[in-house]
């Protein structure tokens, strides 16, 4: 079968021009650290400086990984993460116990957390969470209802 809808991050190199997209949420990726283990400053941190620490990020095939590698490449830097996982929750857990500096979407952060967001001198561009549907597919009534319900909770 084929999927009626795709919920994914954008930019996404796997989505061609044959998809209609709807922005669900705007967000920024942030690097976070437990300051008990990493002496990050309240001043702005350069991307180059981040490379001196163990970086925790999503797996290489994720749109987030692709996006981050491109952002570092744009500054003539090569991003070599220490750990690559398939879960933002696990990245946050590892950062909390001091195993590295994690890169996660800002909406994953909680107030009063042990983690401190790093202020970057070279801010990362914002991204979107989008809903995509293929131009050639007719969206079913069930999918339309799902879209209504899904967008109402965001």
Annotate the PLM regions.
Residues 57-58, 84, 102, 132:
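Active-site-adjacent beta-strand anchor residues
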Residues 39, 53-75, 139-143, 147:
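Secondary-structure junction motif
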Residues 6, 55, 100-102:
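Short, well-ordered beta-strand core segments
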Residues 119-154:
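A late-sequence structural motif
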Residues 2, 64-116:
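Hydrophobic hinge/microswitch elements
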Residues 1-53, 107-110, 124:
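Acidic, Gly/Pro-rich loop/turn segments at junctions of secondary structure
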């Amino acid at each position: 079968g084929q999927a009626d809808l795709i919920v994914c991050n954008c930019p996404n190199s796997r989505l061609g021009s044959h998809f209609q997209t709807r922005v669900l949420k705007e967000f920024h990726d942030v690097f976070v650290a437990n300051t008990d283990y990493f002496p990050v400053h309240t001043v702005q941190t350069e991307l180059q400086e981040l490379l001196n620490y163990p970086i925790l990020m999503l797996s290489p095939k994720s749109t987030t990984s692709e996006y981050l590698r491109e952002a570092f490449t744009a500054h003539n830097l090569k991003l070599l993460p220490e750990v690559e996982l398939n879960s933002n929750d696990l990245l946050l857990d590892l950062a909390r116990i001091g195993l590295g500096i994690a890169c996660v979407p800002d909406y994953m952060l909680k107030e009063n957390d042990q983690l401190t967001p790093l202020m970057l001198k070279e801010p990362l561009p914002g991204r979107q969470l989008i809903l995509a549907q293929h131009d050639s597919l007719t969206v079913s009534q069930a999918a339309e209802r799902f879209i209504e319900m899904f967008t109402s909770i965001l």
